[in-house]
Each structure stands twice: as C-alpha cells, then as structure tokens.
C-alpha cells in the first residue's frame, strides 16, 4: 500500500472555492527527524515564522513582500521536518471505512500533538480533544459518505452546517469548522496500518502549516520550488488565535469509481470548534 495523493482545503471563508492541492511523499522519504538530540512527534517551525505573519498575509494576500517571505519560510519547514513515529513496527491495520473508538481517539490525539507542537512554538494556547468534538467530527464524516462526497469536491458545506445545527453549534452558512484533507489509496481495499495513516496525517498538517505545498512533477525536488507554496489560509485556521478550540479528527472513505472499485479516497476531517460557537450546550455535549 502506498499513499499517492493528498488534497487539502481550508475552513477559511476566503478559501471556500473548490481547489485541491495534490502531493505525494513515498514512505522512503520519511526519514527519522531529530529535534536536537531527542526524537519527538512534532513539527518544528522555522525561525521568523509567526502567527502575526500568517495573519498579515491573510489580510493582504496580494502583498508580494509577505508572500515572498512566507514562501521561503514554508519551504524551509517542508524540507526540515520528516515523519517519525516510534511505533514503526506496529503493523496493526485499521478499517478506514469504520474506525473503532480506540482508533479515532489515537489518530485524533496524534493530529492534536502535531498541531499543538506548532501552536506552542508560536506562543498560542493549545487545542484540546473532547468527546463532543469527536462526535461532531464523526457525524461530518458520516454525512460525507452518505452524500458520496470527498475532498475532491471541496467542503460539503450543506452537510457541515446541518450537522453543526444538530450538535447545537452556530451554522451561518459558511464553513467554520473543517479543514479538509485526504489521501488516495492505490490498493483495492479499505485497510491501512496505523503507521501509514499517521504518515498521511503528518503530511497533511505540514501542508496546512507551510503554504499549502503541492507537488507538480511528483518529485522530492519539487519542495525546492517556491511556486508550489501558494496559500496560508489553512495556517490561519489552525495556527493563529490566542484562544483554545476543541478538536478532533475523523476519516470518511469513498470508492471513487464503483465500477472497478480501485480508486479509493480517504478524506480526513480536521474539526475545530470555538467555544463561542456553542449555542446549545446540551446538544453539543450529549
């Protein structure tokens, strides 16, 4: 099994247009990353990369000066951070179409650790995992499956807002809660090892943080090309804001072509909830 493609789409109102950022990073490129002398599950932020800089770019996305600076910093971040998980020998397989509660929790905590490693370096409060956010995330993934929807179609805005209403959250018609990513499965089944799924999550979050990086020639050398770092709306969603949000991750699984059952799409839903968006606590915490 290999991970072929990852697509990311922002929760930011300014990034709701349909687009996909396609990348590939084979397991052979995932070498151990050493933070100083200690191995960690983390993503290191380049010096000079700040929350203020991200916010400034979102306020002025046409600024050539800001864009040039963020492109260079993002390239540095993409090149210097490599996937590492101390449980590489763990070949336990998970059902991408039906994660157990244990798998959901483990993957959410893994994503949260990476996100908070960046937020901490930027001087921001950590996000927190809650069962309420997990329930919300799971229902969004279920709705994607029911709508035959994936990250290829951008956000399922209608579903997100309907589920938000069910969970007692504000639902103004925009996407306030989801950063969407995904990876194609090149094998003909719906199982992957937990290690492989974490590879996809790690790469998604690097993309979110560092310019929505996308491959064009499917080569590692693409990371050197500044033209492939194009936006920081995802970074604005996850790596700015001097307040905490509740967080959870869910996966949805779609057979893109039912006639041959080969092209499998796993969409990953990075769900974050601002406590101020909780209108009916009794529904959200049920």
Q: How should these model regions be labeled?
A:
Residues 1-36:
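Gram-positive Sec-dependent secretion signals
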Residues 2, 18, 148-151, 209, ...:
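Intrinsic disorder/low-structure terminal segments
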Residues 7, 17, 22, 126, ...:
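Generic hydrophobic alpha-helical segments
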Residues 12-15, 143-156, 182, 187-188, ...:
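Contiguous hydrophobic segments
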Residues 28, 113, 131, 225-228:
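A generic "functional-site adjacency" signal
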Residues 33-62, 66, 162-283:
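A well-ordered secondary-structure block
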Residues 37, 42-176, 235, 242-252, ...:
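Short, well-ordered surface patches within globular domains
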Residues 286:
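Active-site signature of cysteine proteases
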């Amino acid at each position: 099994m290999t991970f072929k493609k990852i697509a990311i789409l922002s929760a930011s109102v300014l990034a709701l247009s349909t687009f996909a950022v396609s990348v590939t990073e084979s397991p052979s490129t995932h070498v151990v990353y050493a933070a100083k002398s200690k191995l960690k599950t983390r993503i290191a932020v380049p010096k000079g990369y700040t929350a203020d800089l991200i916010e400034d770019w979102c306020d002025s996305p046409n600024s050539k000066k800001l864009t040039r600076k963020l492109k260079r910093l993002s390239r540095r971040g993409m090149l210097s951070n490599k996937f590492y998980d101390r449980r590489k020998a763990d070949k336990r397989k998970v059902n991408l179409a039906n994660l157990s509660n244990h798998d959901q929790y483990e993957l959410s905590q893994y994503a949260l650790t990476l996100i908070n490693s960046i937020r901490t370096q930027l001087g921001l409060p950590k996000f927190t995992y809650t069962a309420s956010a997990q329930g919300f995330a799971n229902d969004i993934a279920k709705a994607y499956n029911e709508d035959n929807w994936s990250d290829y179609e951008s956000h399922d805005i209608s579903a997100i807002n309907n589920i938000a209403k069910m969970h007692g959250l504000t639902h103004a018609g925009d996407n306030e809660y989801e950063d969407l990513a995904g990876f194609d499965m090149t094998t003909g089944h719906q199982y992957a090892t937990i290690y492989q799924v974490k590879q996809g999550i790690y790469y998604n979050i690097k993309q979110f943080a560092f310019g929505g990086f996308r491959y064009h020639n499917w080569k590692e050398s693409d990371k050197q090309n500044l033209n492939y770092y194009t936006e920081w709306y995802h970074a604005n969603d996850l790596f700015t804001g001097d307040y905490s949000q509740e967080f959870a991750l869910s996966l949805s699984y779609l057979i893109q072509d039912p006639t041959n059952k080969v092209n499998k799409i796993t969409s990953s839903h990075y769900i974050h909830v601002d406590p101020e968006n909780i209108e009916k606590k009794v529904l959200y915490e049920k």
